[in-house]
Amino acid sequence: MEKIRKNFGFGCMRLPMIGEDVDIEQTKQMVDCFLEQGFNYFDTAHGYLQGKSELALKECLTSRYPREDYVLTNKLSGSYIKKEEDIRPFFESQLAACGVDYFDFYLMHSQSTTNYQHYRDCRAYETAFALKAEGKVRHVGISFHDRAAVLEQILTDYPAIEVVQIQFNYLDYDDVAVQSRKCYEVCRRHGKPVLVMEPVKGGSLVNLPDDAKAVLDALHGGSPASYAIRFAAGFPGMLMVLSGMSSMEQMQDNLSYMKDFTPLNNAERTAVSKVVEIFRKQDLIPCTSCRYCTDGCPKHISIPDLFAIMNTKHTHHDWNADYYYEDVHTGPGSRASDCIRCGQCERVCPQHLPIRQLLQDVAKEFEKG
């Protein structure tokens, strides 16, 4: 962990795209800017962009910079392994895809009650600790999406876990379902450094309702993202706050306030609390656009995009939402009403959303004709 230079990391789940492919030239520019400004932590996973994230990092980062210049985190994704014997070949394929001979951090991906049992059955933790002993992994940790009691159980079962990545932002801090604060407190009790994901909640804390945006604008300070990321970074024990940046503009904004980080002051914390109150009064879908739900959807429904359109209509009363629903994000056989209720999406959703019911709500809103 001593290699980490600053507490802000480049999350590589939302890289800039040109059509279906990663925008390699812009990603190279972003990697260069990130390293030049003194930051060096990169986070990926095989499932990010259907494997293209790992390959992009090889082309934009690992083939262009010495290994000691960056910290690279990858994850063991349970959907790619069926048994213990699958783990090492999968791990070696990740090393090859990323163009490295070791990972600084290797996380058991998206741990929850269901996933955790699968990892135990496959002896995934034991294999990861063995990889560390062999020098192929420097630190073993988990990324986590569930209730605090489940996290407590995992850290009790495997005290050798070194770091925990949790969803943490000011909107989820006291949320009953996500339990960010309670999960953070479990990490602190166990003495585990915390890696923060979703500090802007998939963009929800950037694209604010108009009245919430007005509260932050009155501070005459930074961008909406700056308050969200600084909120997360300001807690003790936060080793890293990740941001899934998809443009140079986003990166430059983030680096401007994280290069010489300062926690939120009292006025800023009060403003953030007001924003939370505004959100609580709105009936928004708490989707973070991770897109885990779309890979296995037999109807190819663009679930996160439909939820985003629904939120946009409720938040901004935007008539354009109907256009985007009809002409951009749906097609024959892939509208919300085409859901066959198989439940595949709900089994992989880190937010545990009732997606089938929500799609019915979307259909009711946009398919009135």
Language-model region placement:
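Structured C-terminal cap/extension of enzyme domains
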Residues: 25, 32-35, 39-40, 59, ...
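Structural motif corresponding to the early beta-alpha repeats
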Residues: 48, 64-84, 109
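Glycine/proline-rich, positively charged
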Residues: 18-19, 32, 36, 81-200, ...
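Short, well-ordered alpha-helical microsegments
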Residues: 53-57, 147-152, 251
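Short, electropositive alpha-helical surface patch
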Residues: 58-71, 125, 158-164, 255-261
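Hydrophobic faces of well-ordered beta-strands that scaffold small-molecule active sites
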Residues: 6-11, 42-44, 70-74, 103-108, ...
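N-terminal binding-site loop/beta-alpha segment at the start of enzyme catalytic domains
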Residues: 1-70, 127, 133
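Residues that line or immediately flank small-molecule/substrate-binding pockets and catalytic motifs
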Residues: 12, 46-49, 107-110, 144, ...
